[in-house]
UniProtKB/Swiss-Prot annotation:
It holds the Pfam family Thymidylate_kin. Keywords: ATP-binding, Kinase, Nucleotide biosynthesis, Nucleotide-binding, Transferase. InterPro entries: P-loop_NTPase, Thymidylate_kin-like_dom, Thymidylate_kin_CS, Thymidylate_kinase. The keyword Amino-acid biosynthesis does not apply. The gene is dtymk. It catalyses: dTMP + ATP = dTDP + ADP. The lineage of its organism: Eukaryota, Metazoa, Chordata, Craniata, Vertebrata. It comes from Danio rerio. This is Thymidylate kinase.
């Protein structure tokens, strides 16, 4: 490897927890420190698979639940070559949702186990840091544009949060919980501090494989 690799940093949380805003602020902060950084979002709605997912989320089409889950996973896998190349080039990737969202949302539906939901994503690039933005779903429901898409109901989001809490028991993943009920700047400071530490640590380590 010709240069120190970038870190893979993921922000997770229930809908409207502020992930997208914080991803943007973190990328700017990393760039201002003199390092390369880019944002990635899942689902990536620009691909053909992503467009199928987008139509489903916007309630323009209906898809069978197993099919939807596998489409979300395929959407992540199709971006793996790009992710690996960028990390090897020393670009830090800040990711707005990843496999953990896929597992939490599908396993919140009746009849889906965590294990079944995790299997399609086994072997994805393993994040160096996963920050969960903790926010009460009732508070999230009062934030802008809530309820416009499928899954944006408080009852479902509470179940999703429970599934995230189960996923966070996995000590092989570097989870950090952030209180997202505070101001944007307070949340950003915590995220920035945690990310700066992990970027330095990740430089000398190979990219791992998720859930292996």
């Amino acid at each position: 490897m010709s240069c120190r690799r970038g870190a893979l940093i993921v922000l997770e949380g229930v809908d409207r927890a502020g992930k997208t805003t914080q991803c943007q602020k973190l990328v700017q902060a990393i760039q201002q420190s003199g390092r390369a950084a880019e944002i990635m979002r899942f689902p990536d709605r620009t691909t053909k698979i992503g467009q199928l997912i987008s139509s489903y989320l916007e309630k323009k089409s209906n898809l069978e639940d197993h099919t939807v889950h596998l489409l979300f996973s395929a959407n992540r896998w199709e971006m793996v070559p790009v992710m690996k190349q960028k990390l090897e080039e020393g670009i830090n990737l800040v990711v707005d949702r990843y496999a953990f969202s896929g597992v939490a949302f599908t396993s919140a539906k009746p009849g889906f186990s965590l294990e079944w939901c995790m299997n399609p994503d086994v072997g994805l690039p393993k994040p160096d840091l996963v920050m969960f933005l903790q926010l009460n779903p009732n508070v999230a429901a009062n934030r802008g544009e809530y309820g416009n898409e499928r899954y944006e109901t408080s009852a479902f989001q509470r179940t999703v949060q429970q599934r995230f809490e189960e996923l966070m028991q996995d000590t092989s993943i570097n989870w950090k919980v952030i209180d997202a009920a505070r101001t944007i700047e307070e949340v950003h400071k915590d995220i920035k501090d945690l990310s700066e530490n992990i970027i330095s640590l990740a430089e000398e380590q190979p990219v791992g494989e998720l859930w292996r």
